Structures are given as structure tokens and as C-alpha cells.
Amino acid sequence: MTDETVKSLAEEIQTPVERLVQQFADAGIKKTVSDSVSQKEKETLLAWLNRDKESTSQPEKLTLQRKVRSTLSVPGTGGKNKSVAIEVRKKRTYVNRDAVEKAQAAEQAQREAEEKARREAEEKAQREAQEKAQREAEEKAKREAEEAKKKAEEKAKREAEEAKREAAELAKREAAEKDKVKQNEKPKADKADQEKARRIAEQAELKRKTEEAQRRKAEEEARIAAEKARRLAEENAEKWTSDTSSETEGTDYHVTTSRYARDAEDESDAEVEGGRGRGRAAKAPRPKKNNRHSEKADREEARAAGRSNKKGKGRKNSTLQQGFNKPAAAVNRDVVIGETISVADLANKMAVKGSEVIKTMMKMGAMATINQVLDQETAQLVAEEMGHKVILRRENELEEQVMNDRDTSDEMAVSRAPVVTIMGHVDHGKTSLLDYIRSTKVASGEAGGITQHIGAYHVKTDKGEITFLDTPGHAAFTSMRARGAQVTDIVVLVVAADDGVMPQTIEAIQHAKAANVPVVVAVNKIDKPEADPDRVKTELSQYGILPEDWGGETQFIHVSAKQGLGIDELLDAILLQAEVLELKAVKEGMASGVVIESYLDKGRGPVATILVREGTLNKGDIVLCGFEYGRIRAMRNELGKEVQSAGPSMPVEILGLSNVPSAGDEATVVRDEKKAREVALYRQGKFREVKLARQQKSKLENMFANMEEGKVSELNIVLKTDVQGTCEAITDALVKLSTDEVKLKIIGSGVGGITETDATLAAASDAIILGFNVRADASARRIIEQESVDLRYYSVIYSLIDEIKSAMSGMLEPEYKQEIMGLAEVRDVFKSPKFGAIAGCMVVEGNIKRNNPIRVLRDNVVIYEGELESLRRFKDDVNEVRNGMECGIGVKNYNDVRVGDMIEVFQVIEIKRSID
């Protein structure tokens, strides 16, 4: 081993080089930084350090003795007090915890080492046994193979000798025959020679084949013997492993014995309690129960029976006494569980108390109350834990029956118009582009020039029919934009040539990819001088949108919504993409579709915009939309004209539903209105039960959160909008504004005008009413004025979110910052009869002002914090002393001012906070 230097040794043990050199010197070894260190010198240094530690070590045990002497006056004989000397001795022993811990650690290490050695010995014995079994099996296989080979060789040798003997006899017979026909003609002799040669060749070939067959047979027997030996070795190894595992399993003996001991204890308890009852026959031994939840109840009943017999020992037993025999075994029931069930109902079905179910759930790690609703999986686990059989029931059988009882046409699917969604960033010209196609002015009618709900339009062009969905581009309408991507066939991504790719553009690409919908890019505002289409292509290529001229699959069309440039090319690209997709739908039969948008009209009631997917929607049909149902009383297209029917890819507004459906719900035409009502009510109840079942359980982290709820400010809001989709978008945007200090709570939201109920709710809960494109009626305005409720109207979502954000910022607690104004050094201390100790100071930094909070610093440590009571300069009271001047300072309620102290004057500044 090569020696290392002092420097490298210091780096290795992570200690300063100078300290290591000094330690070598203390140990009697003179070294420099570059000198080498041998192993012997290292050991010498280590011994010196250990001896040094031992010399300075503390004693392991310390005993303290204390004596307390006192006198006690006690009354004596003759009325005189007598003094008695009392001595109290106390002895206390203190043990060094480090020594005890070291001893325990040493014992633990010794036990671990013994356990490790035992395990290693067992593993070694197991390995040796396995190797021994394997060697024996291999030797046995080798012996069998050699014996088989030897037998095969002997057999082949015998057969070869027999063949040789037969050949000799044959040659002898041929020689005799040859002598017989020696006098025959020469042609006959030639023929005999040929025959002889042929027979010899056949015999040689036969001999070769025989030897080959014998060799193959010997090899096969050897292979079979080796395989047999290998299997025998594996069986021995498995047997050894199973024996070892059975020995290991033997350590769980205490589990089973404890169970048997518990059963025996139950039986002995029953016998003892039964023996207490006078006049009662001996109780037969009870068979072992298979339900562990009834053991405690059995013991309690046995004790109760013993107590009752003990109380009535003097009472004569009646011959007509009604008896009750407790079931000998637990009753396992078939429990039918629906999608949701309360704890009380589950207990009734299992015929047990609700407290037993709650105990079982607590053992499983879940807290529950008697009225809490459980989901199907939780109820199944609880019932199976209590030993019952569970039968899961589907509660949507009626819904499936209604959906199956529909007239769907068996006709062939025909081509339908493509559903095209126009997506893009806000103000990139989506609605203006659709305007030019429809030759209308929709954008001018939008508040603030931005689209705030989905517009569905069916457009007939010279090239064909197209259904357009115009989605908002604002960030708050993410859910609406995602909903548009789910029902569409083609996405037209509008990107402004002068603005490029923006956040909502990226989001639209993600929605289109998630829905697996092809994209056609419309580069808008191409007529502007600062337009840069190549920049748009480059930015979109980073997100997987490659143009066709770059080798991609996406069509890029340059358009101008103002001048109408490229509109025909865009329509051609859309219809070309639709032909590639081969969009088809069944035109006849009961219709089905999707709710695009819904709102509450004051004169017409609930109105829903439905995009038909297949079938034909007729006036008078019974429609089931999510939680709502109804018969179609009227049907209008996007232009407001009455229509009698609508085919696939047609958007229509329908009237006649029971309430406003949620946007995105499936709309299905059914046969029976009564069954449709039952399905709608079932869905409402199921939604409520599932919502209750998903309530947060009581966990430790929630307890702390609930404890701090009182410190959180709340802003209550009642929100009313014109359409359902806008209500969802604004709700999501407002909820995201909540912080840990200010919580925004939407206590009521809906579609339609602000009613008297909304105003009463806001007044009772101290809430703000927000109206988005809606107004309050006369009765609501009267209550709002009487109760002084804050009512605000909005038509653009930007201003709504900004004002709510500023209101929440006002509810935040301000931050307080301390600003140091001046610093004075104490040069001398004077005594004043009025103020006590007066510090004669020199202002070294800033200014000193009267009545400001101060800190007294001694050696840069704060020793007092209070208020400046007196500030004088040459016996005159002053309000301020500037830098470089002398002054006298009196600190309120503090007299321990010393020369050299620093007096720091500061002020507290309040800083308003805002929500980002």
C-alpha cells in the first residue's frame, strides 16, 4: 500500500491541514504538509486521540448525597415543649445516558450480529444441502448414463460378433457351393461372382445401419437418464425449500394459538357465568363461531344471563317459561347494494346495529356517521368485512330500457354537412371571418367586440353546406372551447398574421389534438402591412402543426376577413377535408344530439341550442336532456325562423324543456314522456347522492384547515348570466381567484334575470349580485334598495374579473414594514427626577423624532423595545434632532441605559396588498 501525504489525509478525513499537523506534533510525530504518512504513524495518531478522549471522558454514574437538619418542637410532659432534632437524608444517582445508550447499542449490535450469523449459517447449510443434493443427482445421472452406454456398447459388440459369425458361415456355404459347380460353364461362374459381390455389399450396408441404430438408441437412453436425474435434483431442492418455509411458518404459531386461547376463554367464561345462576342446567358447549364480530356480544349476553339469574335466585321457576335459543352460528345474508346507500340502510340490510357498521369502518380507516351516504365500492368492502355476501344492483336499468326503446332507422348512412369549429386567440378575427361567410354583422352585436357564448350557424355556400361553431377566445372560456372541440369534425384555427401564436392559440391546438380532430389554419389579417405569414408557420410548427408545403398534413390558407381575400379557398379546404373524412349519418329515425348552449328566456322559458348528430328532430318530439325533459313546442334555426324538422349537422333552438339543461348534455328523443320524466328524476337524485358521497371525509389535515377557517375572509357572490355556458366560464374564473386569505364563494348562480329570490338570498348572506347581460326586475330592485345590497351589471368579462379582483384585494390584511429613521449613540447618562435616566446621545444616522417607537441595542443585540418619551436639546424640548447633533433622550419605563448603547428610532409603514 502506498503512503499518502498529510494534505491528502486531511482531505480524506475532512479536517484542516494545520489541525492535523498539530495533532501529529502532540502525538510526538513531526510532520509537514507535504510529508508522507505511513500506516504505523496513522495507528499511533489514532491511539493518541483515543487516549486523549478517554482522559477527558465524563464518569458514567454520579451519586449526590444531601442532608437537611432541622428541629421540631413537640409537647412534652408537664406542659413544656420538647425540641427534637430531625435529619433528612437524600441520595440521588445520575446515570450518563450516552453510556447507557452505547451499552444498549452494543447489545443491539451484538444481537444483530448473532442474528446475522445465524441467518448466514442457515443459508450456508441450505446452500450446502442443495449443492449436495444436486451433486448426488448429477453423479447418479452420470452413473446411469455410463451404465446405459456400457450396455449399449456390449449389445452392439454381441450383435457385431453374431453378424460376423453369420457372414463366415455364409462364406463357408458359398465355398462348398463353389466346389460343386466348379465344372460349370464360364458364364454361370461370372453370374455367381456378381451375385456374391451384391450379397456382400448388402450385408455391409445392413451392418452399418444396425450399428447406427444402436448408437442412436444408446444416446437416447443416456439423455433420458440425465433428464431424470435433473428432475430428481429439482424435486429435492423444492422439497428442501418447502421444508424451510414450513419451519418459517411455524413462527406464526402464536397467532393460531391465541385464537384457540380466545375461544377457550369464551367457553370458560360462559361456564363460569352459567355456574353462577342458581337452578339453571349446565350449558352445552357452544361451537366455534365463524363471525368474529359476534364474540364480544356473546360474552356480554352470558354475563347478563348470569346476573339476572343471581338476582332472581329466590324466585320459583315457572313451568310455562318462554325460552329463546340463540343461534349457534352467525347468519350470513345476501346484501343488495345500489350505487349509493346510507350507513343506516346498510346496517338494516345486514340486521346489525348502525354502531357496529361505524366501528367496522373505523377499523378500516374511514370515519362515518349514521346518515352518511356511502358509494357502492365502500359499502361492498364493509359488508364483506362483516362476513356477508354482496349483490351489486344496477339502478340505471330504466334508463337503459328507455334508450333501447327507440326507433332507429336501418337505412344506409348518407353524407352530412361537416361541423366546423372556429378557434383562436381573442381579437384574431374569428367572428369577423364567420361574418363575411354569412354576410351578416354578428361581431358588431357582441359586447366589447368579443364572443361570450357559442354561436352555431348553418351556412349554405355554392360549394356545399357547412355548420359553423364560433367559440370564444378569452381564457375564461376554456370549458366552452373544449366542448366545441368535442362535437366538431374540423377545427379552423384562426391566427392573426401580425400577432402570431398566442396562449389561447396553443390551447386550441391542444383541444383539437385531444379530440383527434383535423386542423385547417386560417392566417387572418393578411392585408395588414406588418403581416408575417412565415412567422406564423414557424411558430405553429413548434406545436406539431406543419404546413403541406413543408411536408406536413395541415392546410394553411391566407385570408382577410375585412376584404374577403382567400374566403373561397378556405371553404374549398374545409369541404376537401370533409370529403377525406367521409362524414356520414343516418337521416331517418329518432334524433340524438348535443346541447351546445342553453339559457332562460323570460317570455319563452328554457331555451336550448341543440346540434343534431343523427336522425331527424321534429316538432312535438319528447326530448331527454341530462336532468331535464320535455316536448318540443317550437323549433327555430339560427336566423330565428320557425322550422318543423332538423336533420344531421343542423343547429336549432328548441323550446319546451322542464328547465335549463347543462351545456354539453346529450339530447335524445324518446318514446314515452312519463318514462322520460322518471329517468330525469332518477338522474337528479343520483347526481345529488353522488355529490354527497364525494364530500370530504374528516381527516387530520382537514381538521387544521377547519380550525383556520375563521381567519379567512369570505366574499359571497350571487351570479346571474344570460346563457349557461357563460355562467360556467365566469364561475370557473372567479373560483380560481380564491387565495388562502380571501375565499370567494358563489352561493347562487343561474341563467336569466335577477329575481326577488336572488335579492333576498344576497341580503341574507351579505353577498354581491353580479349580473352579466341581465337586469333585475322591479321587485328585486326594491329589495336591493331596502337592504342596501351591492348590485353590479357587466357585459364584458374583463371588467367583471378586474373589479372582483380589486374587491378581494381590499379584503386582504395589509403588510406592515418597519423603516429605521435614525440611530443615536449614548455618550453619557444623567439622572432626572422626572424621567429617571436620561441618555446623552449623538445622532450618527438619520433623524430622531419624538413619540416614535425605539429599540435599545447593546452590542448589536436588542435589549429593550419601547417608546421615546423625552427629547431635548440644551434644556429645550424639540420634536426632531438631525444627524450630527447632540440631544438628551428619555426612554419611557426604562432606566438601564448605559454608555455605548445605541438607540434606534423606527416607524411602522402599512403596505396594501393586492391579488395578482
From Swiss-Prot:
Residues 449-453 are annotated as: G2. Residues 524-527 are annotated as: G4. One of its GO terms (cellular component) is cytosol. Keywords: Cytoplasm, GTP-binding, Initiation factor, Nucleotide-binding, Protein biosynthesis. Residues 50-326 are annotated as: Disordered. It comes from the Bacteria. Residues 470-473 are annotated as: G3. Residues 109-241, 292-304 have a biased composition (Basic and acidic residues). It is found in: Cytoplasm. Residues 415-584 form the tr-type G domain. Residues 277-291 have a biased composition (Basic residues). Residues 424-431 are annotated as: G1. GTP binds at residues 424-431, 470-474, 524-527. GO terms for molecular function: GTP binding; GTPase activity; guanosine tetraphosphate binding; translation initiation factor activity. Residues 560-562 are annotated as: G5. Its main location: cytoplasm. Pfam families: EF-G_D2 (PF22042), GTP_EFTU (PF00009), GTP_EFTU_D2 (PF03144), IF-2 (PF11987), IF2_assoc (PF08364), IF2_N (PF04760). Belongs to the TRAFAC class translation factor GTPase superfamily. Classic translation factor GTPase family. IF-2 subfamily. One of the essential components for the initiation of protein synthesis. Protects formylmethionyl-tRNA from spontaneous hydrolysis and promotes its binding to the 30S ribosomal subunits. Also involved in the hydrolysis of GTP during the formation of the 70S ribosomal complex. This is Translation initiation factor IF-2.
